[in-house]
């Protein structure tokens, strides 16, 4: 009995200590047991469909198939192992395959290694992402084929970035760890523990995003860098959201700063488990 109890404690300890990746539903801010999500962008001037996509999820909240139904029609498939971890992504009619492996680190973080493979060719590592115990991305490495200067700084041909978060799990800094580049910084405002406004500071300018109670963006304001204009807002976008009982968006209407509607509308529909 003592060994059984010890084993249970070790299992509990390992699941709480080591990183657990966020589900696709959480990353997409989709609520409830979503089984299928359909998204369509329509140009109201001529009723033409500009974008049409259907995404299917398993009961655990991860993508299993993504169908693009517009002019670039294709189907993206997601394969998982017996532990529910993503191990392969492939496209119908395409010989490109993405393969994933996992490394648990001594500090409790989890590194996901992404390899790209084409038919009759060696696989190549294109990214290594490390997540903390809360499933937050903290280190991002990605293949940098466009490097022109000081390329010897790259780590195995990859650039390296770090993410830093506040106590609510929202990003406050995004930084290049290999090259001298001014980091992108964020300030976050909350109401009752929910993010209601995020300001991004980068390249001397700033962008302000406002969110509703469901976490959906409802306003975007852009301020140009100093020396470009008088420092006032250069553009404003607002969105009117119609949501279902779960708080998922059914209709997304965009308006400019004069409250004039955009010529496109985004509509969503869902199937639930």
Q: What is each residue range found by the language model?
A:
Residues 20-273:
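Buried hydrophobic residues that stabilize the cores of well-folded domains
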Residues 1-23:
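Bacterial Sec-dependent N-terminal signal peptides
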């Amino acid at each position: 009995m003592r060994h059984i109890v010890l084993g249970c404690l070790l299992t509990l300890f390992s699941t709480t200590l080591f990183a657990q990746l966020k589900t696709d539903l959480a990353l997409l801010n989709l609520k409830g047991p979503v089984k299928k999500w359909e998204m369509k962008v329509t140009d109201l001037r001529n009723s033409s469909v500009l974008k049409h996509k259907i995404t299917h999820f398993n009961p655990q909240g991860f993508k299993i198939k993504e169908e693009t139904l517009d002019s670039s029609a294709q189907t993206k498939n997601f394969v998982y192992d017996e532990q529910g971890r993503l191990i392969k992504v492939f496209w119908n009619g395409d010989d490109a395959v993405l393969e994933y492996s996992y490394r648990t680190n001594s500090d409790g973080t989890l590194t996901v290694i992404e390899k790209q493979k084409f038919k009759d060719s060696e696989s190549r590592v294109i990214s290594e992402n490390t997540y903390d115990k809360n499933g937050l991305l903290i280190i991002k490495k990605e293949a940098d084929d466009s490097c022109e200067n000081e390329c010897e700084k790259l780590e195995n041909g990859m650039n390296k970035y770090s993410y830093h978060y506040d106590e609510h799990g929202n990003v406050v800094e995004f930084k290049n760890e290999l090259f001298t580049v001014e980091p992108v910084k964020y300030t976050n405002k909350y109401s009752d523990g929910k993010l209601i406004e995020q300001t991004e500071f980068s390249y001397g300018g700033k962008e302000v995003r406002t969110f509703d109670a469901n976490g959906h963006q409802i306003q975007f304001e852009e301020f140009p860098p100093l020396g470009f204009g008088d420092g006032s807002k250069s553009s404003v976008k607002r969105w009117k959201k119609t949501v279902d009982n779960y708080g998922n968006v059914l209709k997304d209407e965009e308006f400019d700063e004069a409250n004039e509607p955009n010529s496109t509308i985004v509509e969503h529909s869902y199937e639930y488990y």
